[in-house]
Amino acid sequence: EAERIIRNAVPGITASMKAESAYLQKSYAEKDKYLWEIGFDGAYGSVNAKTGELLSFYLYTENSRKGLSSLSEAKAREKAESFLNKIAPEKFAQSRFYESPDFVIYRTAPGDVTEYRFNYYRQVNGIDFVDNGFSITVNRNSGMIVQYNCNWYDSAEFPAVDGVITEESAFDYIDDAAGFSLMYK
């Protein structure tokens, strides 16, 4: 079933790509979560064993330099967001785009952009949950999504935000309590 889910969700996994391995793994982050990890000839994917949700995939044979070599970053982002809306619409609606300058594009030579990577952080009560959300990579030349990862702690509990003080109030409190001042030694 996990293999079927991955094949149906990931356009780059073709009928000719054989499943070579399958493992049931316990999630390292959530003790009640189990994952099916399927290795294909040229790809990898993982699925939540209880819900059937696609959690990740990577097409490691897709490094094409043929095709839409002019795919813009904006078009690649549209493609990524369309995929996220299809695969995980409720979670995607709780996320916001975050541009990470270090990982946005991949180059094989100066000026040679081969892939665009996009990150989306989960938001809870208007606050970014940095280690939760999505990362997705689009190959510029083929236009294919070559990597997807959903890292989402379903069992996470969040404290209420009622009565939370502002950043400025917190700074003033610490400043008053600690008595910070300039000193010369």
Language model features with spans:
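Long, terminal "pre-/pro-" and other extracytoplasmic accessory regions
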Residues: 1-185
